[in-house]
Amino acid sequence: MTTPAFPDLVPALAAALPELRGKLTANAPIADVTWFRVGGPAQVLFQPADEADLAYALAHLPAEIPVTVIGLGSNLIVRDGGVPGMVIRLGRGFTDIAVDGTTIVAGAGVPDVKVARAAADAGLAGLAFLRGIPGAIGGALRMNGGAYGGETKDALMSARAVDRAGRIHILSLDDMGFTYRHSAAPEDFIFTQATFRGTPGEVAEIQAEMERITSSREATQPIKSRTGGSTFKNPPGHKAWQLVDAAGCRGLVLGRAQVSEMHTNFLINLGCATAAEIEGLGEEVRRRVLETSGVTLEWEIKRIGLPA
């Protein structure tokens, strides 16, 4: 599918942001940074050099330009028409990890699994659950990411964020307002760093727990397919996959998108699906689940951009 290009904003932004150190790219393809491998371009992709560069950009970016943040692209559908405005992706300047006693400080661009490994290597228990989340720390902060009995709220001490005006904030655990797959932090906050606290433990036991999580994921989830991870949040008192299965949606196909046969809360790109097919399949699943069980499933996957 050919997506029309957006107007090129880079020359105007470069003029408005003369001290910018990060990279601006016009009409940047971003499908390949998502796990589904679908979607149109970012009107402008900005990869900030570090937190100060991000704050500078946001402080001087014209207010009428919308801002969207993406991480590793694991829990994300980019629609086929692309994403207008500025898409921010945190790269190398946000990938440091430091361990000090029982404390781990990690940039928002660090994959969750790397934090789990750093904790295990340091003999710190309580963060192994991050091994089961296929995303980055920024996403875990935004949605209280969790898996295998643990959630971000269980280990977080504090977080750093930059708001749309370029102001830097330090948020305590209470400030984050965590609930199931949700943070009450303002929507315009872009997380840049997290500080976690672990509990001293035995390295071998922690590593064994991580291996159990890895084995469980491989046995029960289609992790080798083009998928976005868990599609729907678990409604109170229910498991989303059970509701999807009971609605007869296991293996359901729309175009080149499919509900996984292995785990019904996963959607799969069979090879050359469009974002519209994947999202449309998810909506059909929601319709059937509502019809059969009376439960309205809420998307866990983030969907951004415009239809083609």
Swiss-Prot record:
Its EC number is 1.3.1.98. InterPro entries: FAD-bd_PCMH, FAD-bd_PCMH-like_sf, FAD-bd_PCMH_sub1, FAD-bd_PCMH_sub2, MurB, MurB_C, MurB_C_sf, Oxid_FAD_bind_N. It is an enzyme of class 1 (oxidoreductase). Its cofactor is FAD. Its main location: cytoplasm. The active site is at 181, 230 (proton donor), 300. It catalyses: UDP-N-acetyl-alpha-D-muramate + NADP(+) = UDP-N-acetyl-3-O-(1-carboxyvinyl)-alpha-D-glucosamine + NADPH + H(+). The keyword Cytoplasm applies. Cell wall formation. This is UDP-N-acetylenolpyruvoylglucosamine reductase.
